[in-house]
Amino acid sequence: MTARASGTSGGAVSGIGVDAVDVGRFRALLERRPGVVDRLFTTSEYAYAAVSHDPAPRLAARFAAKEAVLKALGVGIGAADFRDVEVKRDENGAPLLELAGRAAALAAERGVARWHVSLTHTDTVAVASVVAERHR
């Protein structure tokens, strides 16, 4: 399931999720437990962040998006593998979501047809806002 960050909407809102991540705390987690990257992010998500001089804000924004998706689905953190929610970029660089595995199954059960996602980050905070749109 893929979603674009913008475009014409025609369905009803199924769920909304917002999450904020403290970049400093997230950076400290990555330094203390480097293996956590493999549990939270896909290879392409990490590759996108790794080209930055400081990957922590980009990774924190992607983690916020994953949590926001689970909130929009109305489920808890353990309901799906974080790697089942992948933040990609469209041809213009805008974020989009691709769900797989249990996350995709949960979205299908709830009739989610489309996702809208917005990400932002500074050196200190990363925020993601997600809207799940259901079939008409």
Where are these regions (language model features)?
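Core catalytic alpha/beta fold that binds nucleotide/phospho-ligands
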Residues: 1-136
